[in-house]
């Protein structure tokens, strides 16, 4: 494959390449490029938002390049200030290492193991020492840091910015120096940090990395970026049925971006699907493709059949969990908490008043309705939760 053909493939799904000419020049050198992406293990599981970056890394691997998956065990203890209106609480070493264990296992659901080098940035950052850290800090200015939108906003509003928050992007940049990165990939929110990497590499006498930014995946709500804190995520270790149902719940308008960012279908194939397929069938294909990647073709087939029976044909799932209650009668608001469908009475009220509770096919809209537990009740909560409830 020619360098120009590689560049065309790499550009698909990207927002910006800085600089494109530099990337083409590196590709023309005919050697495997050293491609880097860093992930701070601030939470124990990866979700599809992370997969956008992993998918692009895999693409580089398929083109013959070497991927460095950097687990930011050192930087996670500082906390990335990107997009923050206030200081991020630090994590303990124990929390970070526990989260990192799952990252090591989960990344190979996307990346090719033999073409991936997994490294912890504590390997070189702990060895940097006080002298090395001061030398690193001396290579950048506070004025340049304050050009960043989130820092600038906090500074103008009198919200404290702590010194360690300025140091974070410098340490991320030093990761690029440590592994001699040719390319770094990140979300659009990471652009400032990626560009600092170019500057710091120059300061250490290296050729600057090419920065590739990718879109932030919109979550299942169709509004905000995918995040566990927003509850709009699809975890890559979730069971096949949950994963399939969550994907089927996304708005049609974001489905095509998901195809582009999360699957191996190219733009031409996606455009053809958009013209020729019914949106429902296309979304089933998307859900099937993603579940297959993280589980198996057989599990994806079963999840699809289950979804069609349960949601499309409105059948109650036979394998819904059985919940036994001691009470014979409960108010609806207490009933939802007791069966474990919600965590609080306030949440139960919102679900009920929003029309999200059905018992034996009948909608319950008054939180104070008395529910008699006589025989087996078939309970549906929201779009995806099902329970069989009995007394005794």
From Swiss-Prot:
Q: Where is this motif: 'HIGH' region?
A: 41-50
Catalyses: tRNA(Tyr) + L-tyrosine + ATP = L-tyrosyl-tRNA(Tyr) + AMP + diphosphate + H(+)
Record-level Gene Ontology MF annotations:
ATP binding; RNA binding; tyrosine-tRNA ligase activity
Q: Tell me where on the tree of life, at the top rank, the source sits.
A: Bacteria
What UniProt keywords apply to this chain's record, in alphabetical order? Aminoacyl-tRNA synthetase, ATP-binding, Cytoplasm, Ligase, Nucleotide-binding, Protein biosynthesis, RNA-binding
Q: What class of enzyme is it?
A: ligase
The UniProt entry annotates the motif 'KMSKS' region at 225-229
Primary location recorded for the protein, binned into one broad class: cytoplasm
**Signal peptide range in chain numbering:** none
Note whether Lipoprotein occurs among the keywords.
Answer: no
Q: Does Thylakoid count among this protein's keywords?
A: no
GO annotation, biological process: tRNA aminoacylation; tyrosyl-tRNA aminoacylation
One GO cellular component this record assigns the protein to is: cytosol
Q: Detail which positions bind ATP.
A: 228
Q: Which InterPro entries does the UniProt record give?
A: aa-tRNA-synth_I_CS (IPR001412), aa-tRNA-synth_Ic (IPR002305), Rossmann-like_a/b/a_fold (IPR014729), S4_RNA-bd (IPR002942), S4_RNA-bd_sf (IPR036986), SYY-like_C (IPR054608), Tyr-tRNA-ligase (IPR002307), Tyr-tRNA-ligase_bac-type (IPR024088)
Residues of the S4 RNA-binding domain = 330-390
Assembly notes: Homodimer.
Q: Which family does it belong to?
A: Belongs to the class-I aminoacyl-tRNA synthetase family. TyrS type 2 subfamily.
This chain's function reads: Catalyzes the attachment of tyrosine to tRNA(Tyr) in a two-step reaction: tyrosine is first activated by ATP to form Tyr-AMP and then transferred to the acceptor end of tRNA(Tyr).
Q: How is this protein named in the record?
A: Tyrosine--tRNA ligase
């Amino acid at each position: 494959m020619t360098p120009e053909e590689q560049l065309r493939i790499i550009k698909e799904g990207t927002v910006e390449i800085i600089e494109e000419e530099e990337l083409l020049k590196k590709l023309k050198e005919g050697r495997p490029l050293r491609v880097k992406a860093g992930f701070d293990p601030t939470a124990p599981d990866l979700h599809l938002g992370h997969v956008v970056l992993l998918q692009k890394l895999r693409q580089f691997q398929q083109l013959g390049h070497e991927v460095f998956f950097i687990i930011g065990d050192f930087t996670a203890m500082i906390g990335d200030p990107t997009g923050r209106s206030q200081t991020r609480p630090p994590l303990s070493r124990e929390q970070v290492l526990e989260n990192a264990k799952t990252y090591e296992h989960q990344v190979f659901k996307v990346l090719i193991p033999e073409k991936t080098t997994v490294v912890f940035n504590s390997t070189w950052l702990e060895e940097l020492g006080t002298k090395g850290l001061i030398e690193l800090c001396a290579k950048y200015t506070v004025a340049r840091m304050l050009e960043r939108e989130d820092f600038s906003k906090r500074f103008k509003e009198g919200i404290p910015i702590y010194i360690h928050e300025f140091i974070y992007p410098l340490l991320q940049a030093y990761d690029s120096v440590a592994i001699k990165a040719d390319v770094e990939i990140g979300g659009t929110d990471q652009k400032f940090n990626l560009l600092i990497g170019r500057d710091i590499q120059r300061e250490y006498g290296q050729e600057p990395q090419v920065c590739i930014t990718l879109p932030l995946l919109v979550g299942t709500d169709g509004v905000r970026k995918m995040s566990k804190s927003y509850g709009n995520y699809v975890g890559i270790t979730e069971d096949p049925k949950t994963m399939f149902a969550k994907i089927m719940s996304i708005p049609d308008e974001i489905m095509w971006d998901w195809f582009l960012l999360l699957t191996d279908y190219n733009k031409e194939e996606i455009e053809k699907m958009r013209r020729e397929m019914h949106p429902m069938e296309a979304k089933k294909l998307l859900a099937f493709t993603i579940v297959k990647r993280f589980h198996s073709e057989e599990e994806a087939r079963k999840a699809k059949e289950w979804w069609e029976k349960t949601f499309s044909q409105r059948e109650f799932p036979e394998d819904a969990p059985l919940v036994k209650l001691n009470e014979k009668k409960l108010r609806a608001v207490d009933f939802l908490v007791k069966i474990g469908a919600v965590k609080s009475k306030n949440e139960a009220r919102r679900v009920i008043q929003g029309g999200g509770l059905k018992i034996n096919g009948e909608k319950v809209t008054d939180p104070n309705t008395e529910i008699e537990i006589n025989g087996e009740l078939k309970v549906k909560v929201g779009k995806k939760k099902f329970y069989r409830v009995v007394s005794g």
